[in-house]
Amino acid sequence: MHCPFCGANDTKVIDSRLVAEGEQVRRRRECVACGERFTTFETAELVLPRLIKQDGTRQPFDEEKLRAGMQRALEKRPVSVERLEAALAHIKSRLRATGEREVKSLVVGEMVMAELRKLDEVAYIRFASVYRRFQDLDEFREEIDRLAREPAKE
C-alpha cells in the first residue's frame, strides 16, 4: 500500500478490525519511510454475473430493473419494503453462489418467481402472467391450480 503522505511503497499494518457488521476490514497503517499513520478500509468486490438474454445478447445484472419488476408485481399488495429487499438480497446471494460469470436470464426469472411466490401469491400470478406471456384465462387457471397443488419451496 502506498503512503498517501510521502508515496513510499512500504507500510505496515498496526491494527485490523471488522466494521460495518463484518462487511469491511478497517486497517490502521503506518508508513515505514515517514512514520505517518493512516486508515484504510477493505471491502470484498462481489460481482454479480452477466445475464444472457433469450436472444443471446449479454448485459450486466441490473438490480434496479429487477427491483422495479418485483415492485410492479407487488403493487398495492401488503408486502413491506423490508421483505422485498430481503427477497432481492436472497436472489443476489444465490446468483453470486453460482460462481458463474454469466447466467441465463431465465434462471433469474425463475428465482424471482420463487421469491414472489413466498411473498405474495397474487404478485406471483401477476409476474408469471407477464413473464410466461399468458394468452388466455386457461393459462391463468392452470397456474393458479399449480399454485394450489404445489407448496412453495423455501
UniProtKB/Swiss-Prot annotation:
* NCBIfam families, sorted: transcriptional regulator NrdR (TIGR00244)
Instruction: Write down the InterPro entries for this protein, in alphabetical order.
Output: ATP-cone_dom (IPR005144), NrdR-like_N (IPR055173), RNR_NrdR-like (IPR003796)
Q: Which GO terms describe its biological process?
A: negative regulation of DNA-templated transcription
Q: Can you tell which superkingdom this protein's organism belongs to? A: Bacteria
UniProt KW keywords:
ATP-binding, DNA-binding, Metal-binding, Nucleotide-binding, Repressor, Transcription, Transcription regulation, Zinc, Zinc-finger
Lineage runs: Bacteria, Pseudomonadati, Pseudomonadota, Gammaproteobacteria, Pseudomonadales
User: What cofactors does this protein use?
Assistant: Zn(2+)
Q: Which GO terms describe its molecular function?
A: ATP binding; DNA binding; zinc ion binding
* The record's free-text note on cofactor binding: Binds 1 zinc ion.
The name on file for this protein is Transcriptional repressor NrdR
Q: Which residues form the ATP-cone domain?
A: 49-139
Keyword Transcription tagged: yes
Q: Per its database record, what is this protein's job?
A: Negatively regulates transcription of bacterial ribonucleotide reductase nrd genes and operons by binding to NrdR-boxes.
| Species assigned in the record | Pseudomonas putida (strain ATCC 47054 / DSM 6125 / CFBP 8728 / NCIMB 11950 / KT2440)
- Which family is this sequence assigned to? Belongs to the NrdR family.
Zn finger regions (unnamed) covering which residues? Answer: 3-34
Provide an example Pfam family for this protein. ATP-cone
